[in-house]
Amino acid sequence: GVTNKRPELDGEIRTTIDQTAWTDEVFSMKRGKMELVASGTHSLLSADGTPLWLVQKGKFAYRILPEYTREAFVTCETRPTDWVKRNKVNEKKQGLPSEARILRLWANHGQRPVDDTYGYVVYAGRQIPSDELPFRVLQNDTLVQAVCSMDGKVVEAVLYPGNKGLQAEGLSLSASAPCAVLIREEAGEIVVSVTDACMNAALKGIRIVLNGREIKVPMPQRMF
């Protein structure tokens, strides 16, 4: 739901995926092949529109979901620092670095987005991530965000205020209040975990309806 309410102003609307220290080599990956990313700005989509994994050596890997993200970029850059601008206390400090190496990733929505979307994946493992994701996105908008593992044994969903529930292939889910829901199959049983997304201290419980079955989940009371 990204919308620019002042489109007459210069500049583009961006969503930051990550902004961190550029401390080591940065690689893009496609079909298991790694390619060193040079300084400058580069697209996170290959020439044929296929999304690339982007990883800094020893760090997290990122990949956009092209069905939700039209444009995304990475920049490896070195910029001058201004420590006094950050904090006046730094006026008396000596030996602060004069420049910083920065790695930035962002989704670009352009100058006049209206209800634009974005989506990306973060991989925290040590192996080379696969081009085939281990999950599928069921819904990704301002009312419901939900994913399901490829084997169907794990479903994660966030139901925002005003949502009408989730309807997907083989799955129907609704809740009596905004919440985050984790559904997983364990030893032939279905385990449901629910978190009150609004942290409403007066909320006694949340009623979940999963594929027509009602599940009442009490919320913790007097914890704070």
Question: Model regions: which residues?
Answer:
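A structural signal for short secondary-structure junctions
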Residues: 5-9, 97-99, 111-115, 185-187, ...
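Non-catalytic terminal regions with compositionally biased, polar/charged low complexity
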Residues: 123-224
